[in-house]
């Protein structure tokens, strides 16, 4: 039996993209997925790009937006999931080439679903969303590569964003001395509330000049920024340290030299939260419900919005008017 529901749909008209709340039937959703009643979704920078012309995210219009969703299984042909199961969906092709999670119902392939860990609520899962998973995967990879609290401080760039803010909180929970870098000087108190022991400006990381090697300052870094700032911070990582890079808000080109790698043994770790293998994905989500779960997780929430308020929030995230995470209650 079909059900009518509300969803945030992007449509393309000539060279323009418009985003509106539409009434849609479950009959119109893909038939090859697990049908989920969505409780919460979240807004990521990628969602903002998907809702604008020239964003180069959406493959084909019209499309329901939203790369994240958390909710309860309504029906399933997949033996791994049954009616009533609580699940999380992040990334893959959700909200890119397949109808996404900014919707009261979503149809998601079972291969893309993670069972909700016991110590996590559906709301908390979307406070995390793709941003939180990216932060957790960054910390996970850094620790696999030798990061440990006794070796020195850890830098987090873009710290007022979703990935950066959650990374600050997670690292603090793990006992690290966290240095948060931001372009927003007024955010110092907020970042210290999240767990930063020191807040520095982005100019302290990259002052406009690039050196092959600089004074060693941090044992590692979580970097969702990229660009010249990444090139600069690589030159300041301690011997044997690592940088986990997950974004390019500072640019896609990194004008670095090989010297940090060949003279200091620095490692550059690529963080892909979109197609991360399911065994790693599930293991990291378990950590997000336990040793990586910040005591102050909800502090990262900038606002909670309705579906009708979501188009405005999508514009805000592209214009850097959001500090932390925006979650959407369906």
UniProtKB/Swiss-Prot annotation:
SUPFAM superfamilies: GroES-like (SSF50129), NAD(P)-binding Rossmann-fold domains (SSF51735). Its main location: cytoplasm. InterPro entries: Acrylyl-CoA_reductase_AcuI, ADH-like_C, ADH-like_N, GroES-like_sf, NAD(P)-bd_dom_sf, PKS_ER, Zn-ADH-like_protein. The keyword Lipoprotein does not apply. The keyword Cytoplasm applies. Transmembrane segments: none annotated. One of its GO terms (molecular function) is acryloyl-CoA reductase (NADPH) activity. It comes from the Bacteria. GO terms for cellular component: cytoplasm. Its EC number is 1.6.5.-. It is an enzyme of class 1 (oxidoreductase). It is found in: Cytoplasm. It holds the Pfam family ADH_zinc_N. Keywords: Cytoplasm, NADP, Oxidoreductase. NADP(+) binds at residues 45, 160-163, 182-184, 202, 248, 262, 273, 320. Belongs to the zinc-containing alcohol dehydrogenase family. Quinone oxidoreductase subfamily. Homodimer, or homotetramer. NCBIfam families: oxido_YhdH. This is Putative quinone oxidoreductase YhfP. It comes from Bacillus subtilis (strain 168). The lineage of its organism: Bacteria, Bacillati, Bacillota, Bacilli, Bacillales. The gene is yhfP.
